[in-house]
A protein has these predicted regions:
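N-terminal glycine-rich phosphate-binding loop and ensuing alpha1 helix
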Residues: 1-129, 133, 138-146, 404-405
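Left-handed beta-helix
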Residues: 2-7, 34-58, 137-138, 153-154, ...
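Stable alpha-helical structural segments in soluble proteins, enriched in small hydrophobic residues
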Residues: 46, 113, 557-558, 562-565, ...
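Conserved core of the sugar-phosphate nucleotidyltransferase
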Residues: 64-66, 85-88, 92-228
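Short helix/loop capping segments that flank catalytic or ligand/cofactor-binding pockets
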Residues: 80-82, 141-142, 164-166, 192-195, ...
Length: 951
């Protein structure tokens, strides 16, 4: 997927440097300075520029087929957003949302925009390869994206009231065919909308369009004066010209576009925020911050005195008061002498000792110019920077510009170009901070000094247009980073009232390490446990480059604190085991394996503790039997004897010390040792105290023999270790009279895995212990008892579909512990990429739930494929070359397939397109197996899950 940006010319030259992005990730260009192209012509220009840059010798249509592309139009003069005009609207710094985790402390509008557009393009049919969007809006959605239909043009829209719609393009859809465009209107009046409402739905255009190659070529032909790729591009508007020519009954018919098919999609749960002007930047930020009012979901616990005050990368001596409203301070130093009121935007102000009192509506921007100079640009909160200086309607500093000039003895000739305020040379350049303070007072005071007018005339001056060209963006970004370095330790110190521990801590740790910033100290025991965990892992990440030993110690502390949180509840409730069997009785427990279909990983702490998890999985029997079995029987000698049938191993446990050795990974009997501890046979877990294990077993009435059978190869991906642990706990619960139900057994399995230090989530044990096909869900918090919702299993059992479900053992194995540790570390650090992927997985589980409820086999298969793609995106090791080779062999015959569990090997679950395709797969893989041990295993939905019985 390629990202193409249309930016202001000055930004193009240094974009990759100032954003720390790779040229391979973003292609940047700007529209020609000498002429306007419109959104349609600009799209053609951007595509052609990228084509010339990448493969100039290749035919344009062939080049178009190579990749999916996001085109973001982010050029323009930004007249009404002076604070960020030099760097472009898309690089506007946006404050971290107080209710969100994983955002970067220095995130920009571009960082927020891209994930949704990337998700849309990923979900689009292969024929839709080009997405066009605007750079001055932030669009978010609270619901999963719906399926995107095949069409030449697919447009997203939002429902809005008629007044809102009168300021936008509007898609009109016949009520009898609501998914198709009938025609498009630009800014229709409320009266016109009222007339059409009887027969049509009206959906506001949000400027996100997906185009097929056919539609792109049609747009290119309309944009070029001659043939595509030759001659100049004309002005052509994507929305008012191209858009209005589309539909069944277009408002502006065009024969050349009549054959294009169009689909309109409401963006369900969609929200639309403008960042194109100063007032919009502030109002949108306020609206976003206040989206979540439920205090349980607001991470930042401090209460701001004024919700419309935003400070970023700024050193501020005077704390904002209740009287400060609509204030934005960024990349600035405001000492004791600075006093703000309302509607003040302050950006780029270097360290100073000025005495400044800004009236309402007065804003200050300082722009680095050259190597040492600064351009001072005061302006008004609502200034449009449009119109002739002689026009009374043209305002500057929220007053008629003529009035402002008259007070200062400034004449039109001083400005050089007075036909347009944007081109007027108003803003002086100096490297003298004392001069700059005098000039600032001269710009904004009611009684400006004549002497300063002389100073103003004597200095080189730039217009707003000039500043977009002359700004030294590398200096600007360097200053921003220096300001940030001063504020980050303060954020960390004031963590209780700041966003520090909710941001992307991997990114934050990099900033601390690169700039040798003082790390925050260990948090005290009275701090929230999850915050202490974040603190330890943050310190580990920041120390990784300079002190590996200390880094590993901090990481171990984070995992230890996590274990403490999960096991605390189990330790509070002590067990009292007592013998409930006859001397010759055997307790026999057996469980199914599980295949996770969607949402795997969202059950893993700490993600599930922070967000709750959604997982859809199935319990399966293999080759006609439950594959995981445990036998427990009394022993006449007061010791514990563990046996494994499949491993051919045995161990005799006679002391508490031997029982404690459960956390050694690789030990064949770690699970029964930990299970016995949880059942009350280790001090700290039992209700009564004994001096030795032998004494406790004598009091219990017998020794214990535990025999394990796992009829599944190691590293299968079917949840073997977790389900075996649950099966042992189920057997011991019955044998020792503990009375645990299936839910308690699954919860204690989560605790057991933390004791083993293997980590892991809860879906494996719930998947095998609970029967059938189910959606499993938990809510945020350390109590991770899952709620199960069962679905029909007919898709897996009816004769025409049962053969389509194939389970194939690949013979390739991979241990999950190291995979888990890496991804869990990303969860601890609020890694932006990890959290975004996990959020998608969680929503995807609900799509899978719906498909199973609807018994939609075709959709189910495609959703299994999407699950596999999500797993690969989260962990590249999920799909090693040998597995990818297998995927290539079966792909044409499958709707979807995936490796259950963490991936990398084990079993492959396949959903064949039909029984004939399933037969072809069996023939192919039986004739040419992937490895010597590779084989098909018969799978059947388990109707019982965990069963426990006695002889």
């Amino acid at each position: 997927m390629k990202r193409l940006l249309s930016l202001p010319p000055n930004v193009v030259a240094c974009f990759h440097d100032i954003t720390n992005t790779k040229r391979s990730d973003f292609f940047c260009t700007s529209d020609p300075v000498e002429r306007k192209l419109g959104s349609g012509g600009g799209t053609a220009w951007l595509l052609e520029a990228c084509h010339r840059d990448e493969r100039p010798d290749e035919n344009f249509e062939q080049w178009l087929k190579r990749d999916k592309r996001i085109l973001l139009h982010a050029g323009g003069q930004s007249r009404r957003l002076p604070a960020y005009a030099p760097s472009g609207k898309v690089l506007t710094p946006v404050p971290v949302f107080r209710w969100e985790r994983g955002q970067r402390i220095d995130q920009t509008l571009l960082n927020l925009q891209m994930p949704l557009y990337e998700n849309m393009l990923r979900r689009a049919p292969e024929s839709l390869r080009t997405l066009v969007a605007s750079g001055d809006v932030y669009i978010r959605t609270t619901e999963a994206l719906q399926d995107i239909p095949e069409a030449d043009v697919v447009c997203y829209g939002l429902w809005g009231d008629p007044v809102q719609a009168s300021h936008h393009g509007v898609f009109m859809m016949d009520r009898r065919k609501p998914g198709e465009l009938d025609f498009m209107l630009q800014k229709p009046s409320t009266d016109e909308q009222a007339r059409l409402m009887q027969t049509h739905y009206a959906l506001m255009d949000i400027g996100v369009w997906l185009l097929s190659d056919r539609a792109v070529m049609a747009l290119m032909k309309k944009s070029y004066k001659e043939e595509v790729g030759k001659g100049d591009i004309d002005f052509y508007d994507l929305y008012s010209q191209f858009g209005c020519a589309l539909g069944r009954h277009p408002s502006q018919p065009d024969e050349e576009l009549a054959g294009l098919s169009v689909a309109i999609l409401p963006l369900e749960g969609g929200e639309f925020y403008h960042f194109g002007t100063i007032p919009e930047m502030v109002s949108s930020s306020v609206a976003i911050q206040n989206l979540v009012k439920d205090q349980r979901y607001i991470i930042q616990k401090g209460i701001k005195r004024q919700s419309s005050v935003f400070t970023q990368n700024a050193v501020i001596a005077n704390r904002p008061t209740l009287h400060n409203t609509s204030v934005w301070i960024e990349n600035s130093f405001l000492g004791k002498g600075w006093h703000l009121s309302s509607r003040n935007i302050v950006t780029g102000v270097p360290e100073n000792s000025w005495q400044v009192a800004l009236k309402s509506g007065i804003c200050v921007d300082v722009v680095p110019v050259g190597e040492t100079g600064y351009a001072l640009r005061p302006y008004g909160y609502t200034d449009a920077f449009r119109g002739a200086v002689s026009d009374e309607a043209t305002h500057f500093l929220e007053q008629p510009v003529g009035q402002w000039m008259e007070k200062r003895g400034v004449v039109a000739a001083d400005l050089e170009n007075s036909a347009d305020l944007q081109a007027a040379k108003l803003f002086p350049v100096t490297d003298n901070l004392e001069e700059m303070e005098r000039l600032l007072h001269w710009f904004v005071d009611d009684n400006p000094s004549e002497e300063t007018t002389t100073l103003w005339r004597s200095l080189p001056r730039f217009s707003a247009d000039d500043l977009c060209v002359e700004a030294n963006l590398r200096r600007l970004v360097k200053m921003r980073r220096q300001m940030q370095n001063k504020t980050l330790p303060v954020l960390a110190k004031n963590w209780q009232k700041s966003v520090f521990y909710q941001v992307n801590l991997k990114d934050m740790a990099g900033k601390f390490a690169e700039n040798n910033l003082v790390l925050p100290k260990d948090l005290s025991a009275d701090a929230p446990l999850m915050t202490r965990i974040h603190n330890a892992m943050f310190r580990s990440e920041a120390l990784a480059r300079r002190d590996d030993v200390q880094s590993k110690a901090e990481e171990a502390k984070a995992f230890s604190l996590l274990r403490e949180g999960i096991t605390a509840e189990a330790l509070r409730h002590k067990c009292q085991p007592h013998m409930t069997t006859c001397a010759d009785q055997i307790v026999w427990a057996r469980s199914a394996a599980r295949i996770d279909l969607a949402g795997g990983w969202t059950d893993t702490p700490p993600y599930s503790l922070l967000f709750g998890g959604n997982v859809v999985n199935i319990a399966i029997e293999m080759n006609g039997q439950p594959p995981l079995q445990v036998y427990v029987k009394p022993s006449s000698e007061p010791v514990v004897i563990c046996r494994s049938i499949d491993l051919g191993a045995m161990e005799r446990i006679e002391t508490f010390e031997e029982l404690k050795q459960y956390d050694k990974v690789g030990s064949p009997f770690s699970i029964p040792k930990a299970a016995l501890s949880l059942a009350g046979f280790l001090p700290g877990f039992g209700a009564e105290t004994y001096t030795s294990l032998r004494q406790q077993l004598e009091a219990f009435g017998c020794g214990i023999e535990i025999t394990l059978l796992s009829a599944i190869p190691t590293g299968s991906g079917l949840g073997t270790s977790s389900i075996l642990a649950a099966t042992v706990l189920g057997a011991l619960s019955d044998f020792c009279g503990l009375g645990w139900d299936k839910n308690e057994i699954c919860y204690r399995t989560l605790v057991l895995e933390q004791m083993l230090t293997t980590g892991g989530g809860w879906q494996d044990q719930y998947g095998g212990v609970l029967n059938g096909v189910k959606l499993l869900q938990t809510v945020p918090g350390f109590d991770q008892n899952a709620t199960a919702r069962w679905m029909p299993d007919s898709m897996f059992s009816v004769p025409e579909l049962k053969p389509c479900h194939l389970l194939y053992y690949t013979g390739v194995t991979r241990t999950a512990k190291h995979i888990l540790a890496e991804i869990v570390r990303g969860m601890f650090l609020n890694n932006t990429r990890h959290l975004a992927l996990l959020g998608d997985m969680k929503r995807h589980a609900m799509d899978m739930y719906e498909a199973l409820q609807l018994n939609d086999f075709n959709r189910y298969g495609h959703l299994v494929r999407r699950t596999w793609n999500q797993n690969k995106a989260l962990d590249s090791g999920t799909n090693p070359p040998v597995i990818e080779a297998l995927c290539q062999r079966i792909d044409d015959y499958c709707l979807g397939y995936k490796l259950p569990g963490a991936g990398g090997g084990g079993f492959m679950y396949m959903v064949a397109k039909d029984p004939a395709a399933a037969l072809r797969i069996r023939e192919e893989l039986t004739s040419h197996p992937l490895s010597p041990n590779a084989r098909f295993v018969e799978m059947k939905i388990s109707e019982t899950g965990l069963q426990v019985s006695r002889s």
